[in-house]
Amino acid sequence: MVYKYDFLVIGAGVAGMSYALKVAREKKGTVCIICKAGLDEANTSFAQGGVASVTNLELDNFDKHIEDTMIAGDFISDRAAVEQVVRNAPAQIQEMVEWGVNFDRKDDGKFDLHREGGHSEFRILHHADDTGAEIQRGLMEAIRNNPDIEVKENHFAVEIITQHHLGVRVTRRSPNIQCYGAYVLNPITEKVDTYLSKVTVMCTGGCGAVYLTTSNPVIATGDGIAMVYRAKGTVADMEFVQFHPTVLHNPKETHPAYLITEAMRGYGGILKLPNGETFMEKYDERLSLAPRDIVARAIDKEMKIHGLDHVCLDVTHKDPAETKHHFPNIYQKCLSIGIDITTDYIPVRPAAHYMCGGIKVDLNGQTSIERLYALGECSCTGLHGGNRLASNSLIEAVVYADAAAKDSLQHVDLYDWNDKVPEWNDEGTMTNEEKVLITQSVREVNQIMSNYVGIVRSDLRLHRAWDRLDMLYEETERLFKRVKASRDICELRNMINVGYLITRWALERKECRGLHFTTDYPLHAYDK
């Protein structure tokens, strides 16, 4: 089956939906959103924190937000990208409000602003402790009420279409690679359909699911990054994987693991070993209030030293009523698995949280492949550099969605559908009856990435990961050519590709910088 759209959006988080709304209102063509799960299951929904934007000019200004972002990124952020996001943020906040997103306000009607780690001022807009879910709700409502946007839920993009599919040899040095759309798996027919487009936008989110434990949903398998890499597009900064230091240790919930907010440490929570011994004094004078990456590395090291699968966060010394008031959701969540946080330690461990790198884009969100844009966590704008500043990701998504919408609307009339694109050919393949091969390989990828390419790295571990991933790659490609395309084998391919990219970029950075910490090159660039 062949479908034709002017704008094809792959992914339905804040980036994909805001882009779709922006192009649809201009009435310049048909818009389709491909969503691998339900519309409400995007990673955006899991964002607890908020949206960073300068809204109180009496106390804050753009220069402060820019400087905070550069410091957090270890001074390898692209300053032009930082300026673009910070200076355009207020206008995009206003547009989200117009779409129906509710941010908490004070009695005087002004935004109730929070302050998070790394920010010098109060500038975080939020909706209670579920900002991402509120943004997703507001945008979903706007999407469903827009007759000009078609949504294909539970459809899976398998590959983007380029000249390669027309029989042309395409390499990473090939000039003018063009994207003509995507091959998409229909879950009802179990067939791969051809979606031709004039403009394609990749908004597939992050890749936390390549690790054993992640705050991301199970669908965060790095699909967009892998597809663009296979199509010979440019990726960047893949070594910078942000780990949240404290998720609830619950072997039954790993994708996503339940976040234990950093506000709990700000409230007075103390990190301890299960025997009650404190350990943060060995790593930082700020103890449990040290920055996220330092705390994550400290916990990781203590777990490895003592052979533990978790450490503990202790708030039992705080007033029980106050704890329940400040953290009602965490209290109820822990209680549901038999832990009363007013009397018991909370078992916590680090988890993969955010990919700072991804598909390299310019200030318009344009990738190295013509007619293809990338937005949100799957993209690498240069904003985050070596480490993401808290709450900068959601605003990055909408600012770049706006830039990409404006740029693509100017160019869409120059393009046409390429009717020479062949339909997906799976002749000679068979239905895979050996699902155990896929599930076992997924477990192996998770183990490899967590043990060898995690928070603390070494060349020995990275080379071992490279070798193991290479073997899995060969096995999986042979299987992929033999069986009909399915979501599980496509996700496995993507996970292996992304795991390889993280490993390769980590091997190439011979220093400790941002989120990349290696025992073989302990000096920071500034210390050399």
Located regions from the model:
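Short beta-strand "acidic-cap" motif of Rossmann-like dinucleotide-binding folds
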Residues: 29-35, 237
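Conserved redox-cofactor binding core of oxidoreductases
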Residues: 97-191, 203, 247-251
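Short hydrophobic core segments
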Residues: 8-10, 195-204
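Conserved N-terminal glycine-rich FAD pyrophosphate-binding loop of Rossmann-like flavoproteins
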Residues: 37-68, 74, 242-246, 255-256
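Glycine-rich Rossmann-fold phosphate-binding loop(s) that bind the pyrophosphate
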Residues: 12-14
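An anion/pyrophosphate-binding glycine-rich loop and adjacent beta-alpha core
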Residues: 227, 233-341, 346, 398, ...
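Short beta-strand to alpha-helix junction loop
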Residues: 77-90, 123-141, 152, 214-222, ...
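Glycine- and aromatic-enriched mobile tails/lids
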Residues: 1-6, 19-22, 29, 38-40, ...
